[in-house]
Regions:
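SAM-dependent transferase fold signal centered on methyltransferase-like domains
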Residues: 1-383
Length: 383
């Protein structure tokens, strides 16, 4: 975390010029450069501004101040921009670096965002100034203290609770995070009729619907990695959505999600296409429903198989060269020493263990997909 003294230094023209002059350099070289004032402080900013070019490009372009821990915990711009809420005024209970508040400010006329740490609150306010976000008010207080005030009214309350314990362990359960949203529900309920909560990508969709029965729950992925599970408790549900940013979304009710029948027996000779559902569909347990009528799939965590190339798929599609039972000895004879891309779903061995068993190394000579269907293990060679 940046100390109050370091924050004061970061505001000076001398340090700001040094940061600007050294962007693009190796941070280690900057830290050891005797000609750079406050070299270690400058090097840290150079390092995180470089990382922000991909994760938070607006922050990078404005040369915002980036505390390392707050940066690591911040939403990416792609995820922050996606939040499906809008209105007149929103209360953000968990400012942090402020990426979510910054993008909420584009959807709301007024944003009030809370930050318990005084220095981080000052940094967030300074960054909003640099970003030109004039409709955001940063309040240095806790969610518990602010919500205790009488007469509050907001169109939405937003929260991204801190999911790390005091000793650095990652937390998943909502009641273990800070602030404890569940214990604050009476105060939140009198402040707004709508609540949006960002959760860990490990958070269970079923648990979200149990805690908030009338909610919409969305699993969000970026680059085929599940980034967050978002609860929209506004009484418009229940509903489940899988969103792959840049690829598309698919929505169903909980009743629909549990409805798809399993295909019959696996007949490998029928199939010419392998479908890899996006991880958002897996997380939301909507893969089978999404592929219904387009591809056969036996498990929410498995692959889909199609005789004709399916269209409108949220995921990837590969042409199949062959499908055969998994026989590690035969595969080792065929591929030992070759470069291989190994994919797996619903398969008991990690990719590293498969590579060891088959005697292959990372490469693109061949692409193999491993899976389990029923009691059988299969390997799919892809074109």
């Amino acid at each position: 975390m940046i100390t109050p003294g370091e924050y004061t230094l970061l505001l000076t023209d001398e340090v700001q010029r040094a940061i600007a002059a050294n962007r693009g350099r190796d941070p280690l070289e900057v830290a050891l450069d005797r000609n750079t004032p406050h070299a270690r402080l400058v090097a840290t900013q150079v390092k995180y501004l470089a990382r922000a070019e991909a994760k938070l490009p607006s922050y990078a372009a404005a040369q915002c101040i980036l505390p390392p821990l707050a940066f690591e915990q911040a939403s990416s711009e792609a995820c922050a921009a996606h939040k499906r809420i809008a209105g007149g005024a929103v209360l953000d209970l968990t400012c942090g670096l402020g990426a979510d508040a910054f993008f909420l400010a584009r959807r709301f006329r007024r944003v009030v965002t809370l930050e318990r740490d005084q220095t981080l609150a000052r940094i967030a306010a300074e960054n909003f100034r640099r970003l030109g976000a004039a409709n955001i008010e940063v309040v240095n207080t806790s969610a518990e203290t602010y919500l205790a005030q009488p007469g509050l009214h907001f169109d939405w309350v937003y929260a991204d609770p801190d999911r790390r314990s005091g000793d650095g362990r990652k937390l998943v359960r909502l009641e273990d995070c800070s602030p404890d949203i569940l214990s604050l529900m009476p105060l939140i309920g009198r402040t707004s009729g709508r609540l949006c909560v960002k959760n860990s990508p490990l958070f269970d969709i079923g648990e979200a619907l149990r805690l908030f029965p009338g909610a919409r729950v969305e699993a969000v992925s970026l680059g085929d990695e599940c980034k967050e599970v978002v609860i929209y408790a506004d009484g418009t549900g229940p509903g489940i959505t899988a969103t792959a940013l840049g690829r598309g979304s698919f929505t169903a009710t909980p009743a629909q999600a549990g409805a798809p029948p399993h295909p019959g027996a696996f007949e490998p000779d029928r199939y010419r296409w392998l479908v890899v559902p996006d991880v958002a569909l897996q997380k939301a347990r909507l893969a089978r429903l999404h592929l219904r009528g387009k591809a056969d799939i036996w498990s929410e965590n498995g692959y889909g198989f199609a005789a004709e190339r399916p269209e409108g798929i949220i995921g990837r599609v590969f042409a199949i060269e062959s499908i055969e039972p998994y026989d590690p000895r035969r595969l080792k004879r065929a591929f030992k020493g070759r470069g291989a891309e190994l994919m797996k779903r619903d398969f008991p061995f990690a990719a590293e263990e498969l590579a060891r068993r088959l005697g292959v190394h990372a490469g693109n000579d061949v692409r193999l997909a491993f899976t389990k269907i029923g009691s059988g293990f299969w390997v799919v060679r892809l074109e």
